[in-house]
Amino acid sequence: MLKHEYVVKQKITLGGGLDMVGRIYHVGLTVSDLDKSIAFYRDILGLKFQGEILMVGEATDKIFCKENCKARVAYLNASENIQAPPAELIQFIDNEIRKIEPDLFATSISELCFYTNDIDLVYEDLIKNNVECLSEPQYFDFSSDGFGKSRAFYFKDPDGIVLEMMQPL
């Protein structure tokens, strides 16, 4: 159970009182090889495969701003809870993927963070599976700021996407 408590200070609503923004629905990651990425997130990280879809057609072209766009999309989640957002893995078909070097200091999504209750065991397992870890688990104490204590480390998926593992203490 997470020990952190976050408070929404302002709720954004539309004219009819409808919530404009709700919970995070999923986190999308563009990958070069969907099958390889599914294997990593499922077999190494232990996420549950929820399914795969093929996106094609006019709506797909419009949402991705690309003509004749096709994408294989898979969903994996570590939780059965509908409130927990899944990882959405996207492999574009017949379109060249530009691979960029992840940079924690560039404006972008810096990392996708996963929760664990045994960070040392996860770290050892990732090392055994030849996963590139950017450091060993590190200790953080943000108690005075209201966020508590934790241990965390960054690591990379098969495409070099930076991920984080965190254990609240």
Identify the residue ranges that each predicted region occupies.
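Short hydrophobic alpha-helical segments enriched in small aliphatic residues
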Residues: 5-7
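Vicinal oxygen chelate
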Residues: 17-19, 24-32, 52, 74-93, 98-169
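Core segments of cupin and vicinal oxygen chelate
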Residues: 30-83, 148
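Conserved long hydrophobic alpha-helices within structured protein cores
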Residues: 39-55, 85-91, 122-137
